[in-house]
């Protein structure tokens, strides 16, 4: 399966890793920069912790970088 591993950076996952994931969470700069985003491949969907969100899928390029809401001018 082909997953995004970074912004506009699709790569073929290693054997045995057939799940793409998008994990997001807030850090100290969340209010000014938005959530931290991690994209990648995994054998199984990562475990969701209380402070982050995880979305998993299993088709090629199904985990693009999330669109961040824009602030009004």
Swiss-Prot record:
It is found in: Secreted. This is Alpha-elapitoxin-Aa2b. Keywords: Acetylcholine receptor inhibiting toxin, Disulfide bond, Ion channel impairing toxin, Neurotoxin, Postsynaptic neurotoxin, Secreted, Toxin. Disulfide bonds join 3-20, 13-41, 26-30, 45-56, 57-62. Binds with high affinity to muscular (alpha-1/CHRNA1) and neuronal (alpha-7/CHRNA7) nicotinic acetylcholine receptor (nAChR) and inhibits acetylcholine from binding to the receptor, thereby impairing neuromuscular and neuronal transmission. GO terms for cellular component: extracellular region. One of its GO terms (molecular function) is ion channel regulator activity. Transmembrane segments: none annotated. Expressed by the venom gland. Pfam families: Toxin_cobra-type. The keyword Lipid metabolism does not apply. It comes from Acanthophis antarcticus. Belongs to the three-finger toxin family. Long-chain subfamily. Type II alpha-neurotoxin sub-subfamily. Its main location: secreted.
């Amino acid at each position: 399966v082909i997953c995004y591993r970074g912004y506009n950076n699709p790569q073929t996952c290693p054997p045995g890793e057939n799940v793409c994931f998008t994990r997001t969470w807030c850090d100290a700069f969340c209010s000014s920069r938005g959530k931290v985003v991690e994209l990648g491949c995994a054998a199984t969907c990562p475990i969701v912790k209380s402070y982050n969100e995880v979305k998993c899928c299993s088709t090629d390029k199904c985990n693009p970088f999330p669109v961040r809401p824009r602030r009004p001018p």
